[in-house]
UniProtKB/Swiss-Prot annotation:
Residues 396-408 have a biased composition (Basic and acidic residues). Coiled coil: none annotated. Residues 184-195, 426-436 have a biased composition (Acidic residues). Keywords: GTP-binding, Initiation factor, Nucleotide-binding, Protein biosynthesis. Pfam families: eIF-5_eIF-2B, W2. InterPro entries: ARM-type_fold, IF2/IF5, Transl_init_fac_IF2/IF5_dom, Transl_init_fac_IF2/IF5_N, Transl_init_fac_IF2/IF5_Zn-bd, W2_domain. GO terms for biological process: formation of cytoplasmic translation initiation complex; translation. It comes from Caenorhabditis elegans. This is Eukaryotic translation initiation factor 5.
Length: 436
């Protein structure tokens, strides 16, 4: 069934049509997802890359999205009704497809000087796209391709040109023509074409017009790319300031791996000196850019910490409690996340048996967190001092003394009970003898 692209138009003979959105729910539990089976056809009708409307769904629904262009699978995490998605698609069409003047869906998008321009091929109107929407940021990082007719470029230049020359020439021609058709004289400077480099290479501005295909790669490939990016940033010491740290987060967001990036952070920036060099405190701001108010990211970070402890077992296994306490003290991991981690050992990052060892060594801290949660009012001001260079902290010593006192009390009670029983038996024997 075909629908009008602009569903506000009720005319059955409206020339601009698109397929009705078809959605299929797959999986169950935490893995439930909605696959939009005909997103490629819809995107073709709208003349937009299929990842744009898919990403728009994610922005509006607050859900993660996945693209597999090779197999034409466009996924929105969670269970979503097709009619609801169709209504949300209308919002995308209104904001990113329809012309603001003639309301026809014959617009083209151009990313130019940190701005997104829309040019209508029907009426010639040119206007800016709202940059406040989250999708605008995605479009800036993943600009649409320009379809180049190389034969026209050659005819215009009067000679054969390289592919790069032709692409630059046609793109410049499109931008130049959009100036002539625009009613807004203030945009003239912004739309002035940049000169084509004589060596045939695309300029930096034209390079951004190539669609970023990294999102079409598998998650494993993207994780490898992000891991390499983190290693290079560490090697070049680009993480000491806010700008460098933000660059790492932006790259993770570009590859749609912000939560799982925490796992890589632990492996790249933490090692056997995590306690002695106070590495968690040192990289606190960087870690918080990924884990703040995000319990999934915190769980991935704890998985990475497990791997670091496993890699340096001799040095770190006995200091597991210190590491967990440091994560808590620096607000990198929340109390609930740490307690939940300690209650259920996982085999996802290290073997289950080794995960249990880490949790056992961290038990004093986990017990303290549970007690603090139960007795918040009484123990809100309690502080626990952990020294990285001290083998046994004051806190651990207190926990052991407490356990020893409880054992002594139990032993004393048992001794007193046995003495009372013996005394009762003697009394009974005395009474029997007196009776005789």
């Amino acid at each position: 069934m075909a629908l009008n692209v602009n569903r506000a138009v009720a005319d059955p003979f409206y020339r601009y049509k698109m397929p009705k959105l078809s959605a299929k729910v797959e999986g169950k539990g935490n893995g439930i997802k909605t696959v939009i089976s005909n997103m490629s056809e819809i995107a073709k009708a709208l003349e937009r890359p299929p990842m744009y409307p898919t990403k728009y769904f994610g922005c509006e629904l607050g859900a993660q999205t996945n693209f597999d262009a090779k197999n034409e699978r466009y996924i929105v995490n969670g269970e979503h009704d097709a009619n609801k998605l169709q209504d949300i698609l209308d919002g995308f069409i209104k904001k990113f497809v329809l012309c603001k003047s003639c309301e026809n869906p014959e617009t083209q998008l151009f990313v130019r000087k940190n701005n997104i321009k829309s040019k209508c091929k029907a009426c010639g109107c040119s206007f800016d796209i709202d940059l406040k929407h989250k999708l605008s940021t995605f479009i800036m990082k993943n600009p649409p391709k320009i379809d180049v007719d190389f034969s026209k470029a050659e005819q215009k230049n009067g000679k054969k040109t390289s592919g790069a020359d032709a692409a630059a020439a046609v793109a410049a021609d499109i931008i130049h023509n959009s100036d002539k058709g625009s009613s807004n004289d203030d945009d003239d400077d912004d739309w002035e074409p940049e000169p084509v480099e004589p060596n045939g290479m695309l300029s930096a501005g034209m390079g951004k017009l190539v669609l970023d295909k990294d999102l079409e790669k598998s998650e494993e490939q993207r994780l490898d790319m992000l891991h390499t990016f983190f290693l290079k940033a560490k090697e070049e010491d680009r993480i000491s300031d806010a700008k460098g740290q933000t660059a790492l987060r932006d790259e993770a967001e570009r590859l749609e791996l912000k939560q799982k990036a925490s796992l890589l952070l632990a492996n790249v920036f933490l090692d056997e000196k995590v306690i002695t060099d106070k590495q968690i405190s040192k990289h606190r701001n960087l870690l918080l850019r990924f884990t703040l108010n995000d319990k999934k990211a915190q769980r991935y970070l704890l998985g990475g910490v497990e791997q670091v402890i496993h890699k340096h077992e001799a040095e770190l296994l006995s200091k597991s409690a210190h590491i967990i306490k440091s994560l808590y003290d620096e607000d990198v991991c929340e109390e609930d996340s740490l307690i939940s981690w300690g209650e259920k050992p996982s085999s996802k990052y290290v073997s289950k048996s080794f995960a249990k060892k880490i949790i056992e060594n961290s038990q004093p801290v986990l017990n303290w967190l549970k007690e603090a949660e139960e007795e918040t009012e009484e123990e809100s001001d309690d502080e626990i001092a952990f020294g990285g260079d001290v083998k046994e902290s004051e806190f651990l010593r207190q926990q052991k003394e407490k356990a020893a006192r409880e054992a002594q009390q139990k032993s004393a009670k048992a001794t007193n009970g046995n003495a009372a029983a013996a005394s009762g038996a003697n009394d009974e024997e005395d009474l029997d003898i007196d009776d005789i």
